[in-house]
């Protein structure tokens, strides 16, 4: 996994400041309506994907194809069950978030290792089947191999999360 705190200041269009907790649970927004410099955003994702590939060499090659960026707004009621991604690498970047939720896990991204591990519990068994929670704080960023599962904890009333999701084409 590659972690970073990436300041989105200067990349967000004024329309990002007009977002609120009111609206559909999941809103897909064209990236160019929220991100003013898509080339700069792509470069930031590319840096994370390169770092991820370097940490996993030789099993995970750096992306040679395109990096696709999607922008979503998550609001009350949105959640995503654990699922994998067909991309070789995927990354999330929290661009903005509304008020802090009552439950710290509300709107959090959960990254999990879907492997169950060895049948005999041991210290080595803890290497498999673990998970990591990334809270919905502006600037939070993580890149992971696409085979890891990701989920989103249910978003609370009065909360919204603006997120850019990048994936590499296989």
Predicted regions and their residues:
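Intrinsic-disorder/low-complexity, polar/charged segments enriched in Ser/Thr/Lys/Arg/Asp/Glu/Gln
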Residues: 1, 88-90, 141-143, 161-163
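Non-heme Fe(II)/2-oxoglutarate
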Residues: 1-61, 68-70, 78-79, 108
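Short, Φ-rich (hydrophobic/aromatic) sequence segments
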Residues: 15-18, 94-95, 166
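Hydrophobic, well-ordered secondary-structure segments
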Residues: 45-48, 136-137, 150
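Residue-level preference for beta-strand/loop junctions
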Residues: 63-65, 85-87, 158-160
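Catalytic core of non-heme Fe(II) oxygenases with the double-stranded beta-helix
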Residues: 70-141, 153
């Amino acid at each position: 996994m590659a972690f970073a705190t990436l300041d989105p200041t200067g990349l967000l269009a004024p329309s990002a400041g007009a977002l609120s907790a009111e609206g559909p649970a999941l809103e897909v927004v064209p990236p160019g309506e929220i991100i003013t410099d898509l080339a700069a955003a792509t470069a930031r994702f590319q840096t994370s994907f390169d770092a991820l590939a370097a940490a996993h060499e030789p099993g995970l090659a750096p992306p040679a194809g395109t990096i696709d960026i999607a922008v979503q707004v998550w609001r009350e009621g949105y959640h995503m069950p654990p699922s994998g991604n067909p991309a070789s690498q995927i990354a999330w970047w929290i661009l903005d978030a509304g008020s802090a939720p009552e439950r710290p896990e509300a709107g959090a991204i959960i990254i999990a290792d879907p492997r169950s591990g060895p049948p005999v519990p041991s210290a080595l068994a803890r290497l498999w089947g673990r998970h990591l929670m990334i809270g919905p704080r502006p600037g939070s960023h993580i890149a992971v191999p696409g085979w890891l599962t990701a989920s989103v904890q249910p978003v609370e009333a009065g909360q919204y999360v603006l997120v850019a999701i990048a994936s590499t084409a296989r």
